């Protein structure tokens, strides 16, 4: 990202719904961890693992959230947009982002395995917060009955989403169903990273 872009707070503020003070703090954080104006997946992975422990699902979800254009790097605009999305999100602006985040391998479809991983990560995050963030995600243990219940929840949801029963949920299926059912939209968007987890970059908003 060039210096001209980093100074263009006006456009970024409008898109991210963050103010100048927020962006100034974010730019300092971005510069502290970026190399040549960008953050690569391995860089983000190290930050996430330091905070939460090793959890590939969380890393994939967060990286997909930040890497908006899919070029495998995160520039400051993407960094600010993702943070702004997390702190200012509404039901109407998260459906597309939810699909992008849940499509863990970026192949354009959500598989049953990916949906299970997303729901499992979400439940672990709930437990992480309940434990005052003292136990890393990869150290949290779930009882077999909890795992079974979580997988069943994910499988039931997958059956709803996989309209044409081809074993994958396309973006079209996802958006169509979420847009036609407020209850389903709320459920799907609740699986995104929770606001309480925003401190992995040291943010305090």
Swiss-Prot record:
Ca(2+) 1 binds at residues 67, 69, 71, 73, 78. It comes from the Eukaryota. It holds the Pfam family EF-hand_7. InterPro entries: EF-hand-dom_pair, EF_Hand_1_Ca_BS, EF_hand_dom, Recoverin. It comes from Dictyostelium discoideum (Social amoeba). The keyword Metal-binding applies. Belongs to the recoverin family. PANTHER family: CALCIUM BINDING PROTEINS, NEUROCALCIN HOMOLOG. Probably binds two or three calcium ions. One of its GO terms (cellular component) is phagocytic vesicle. Residues 54-89, 90-125, 149-184 form the EF-hand domain. This is Recoverin family protein DDB_G0272130. The lineage of its organism: Eukaryota, Amoebozoa, Evosea, Eumycetozoa, Dictyostelia.
């Amino acid at each position: 990202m060039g210096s001209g872009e980093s100074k263009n707070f006006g456009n970024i503020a409008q898109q991210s719904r963050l103010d100048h003070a927020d962006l100034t703090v974010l730019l300092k954080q971005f510069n502290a961890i970026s190399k040549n104006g960008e953050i690569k997946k391995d860089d983000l992975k190290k930050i996430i693992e330091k905070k939460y422990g090793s959890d590939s699902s969380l890393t994939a979800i967060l990286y997909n959230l930040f890497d908006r254009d899919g070029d495998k790097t995160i520039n400051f605009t993407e960094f600010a947009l993702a943070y702004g999305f997390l702190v200012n999100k509404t039901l109407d602006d998260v459906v597309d982002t939810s699909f992008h985040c849940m499509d863990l391998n970026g192949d354009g479809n959500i598989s049953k395995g990916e949906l299970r991983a997303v729901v499992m990560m979400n439940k672990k995050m709930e437990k992480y917060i309940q434990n005052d963030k003292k136990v890393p995600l990869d150290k949290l243990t779930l009882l077999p009955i909890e795992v079974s219940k979580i997988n069943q929840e994910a499988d039931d949801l997958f059956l709803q989403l996989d309209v044409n029963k081809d074993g994958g949920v396309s973006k079209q299926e996802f958006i169509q169903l979420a847009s036609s059912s407020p209850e389903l939209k709320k459920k799907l968007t609740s699986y995104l990273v929770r606001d309480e987890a925003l401190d992995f970059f040291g943010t305090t908003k």
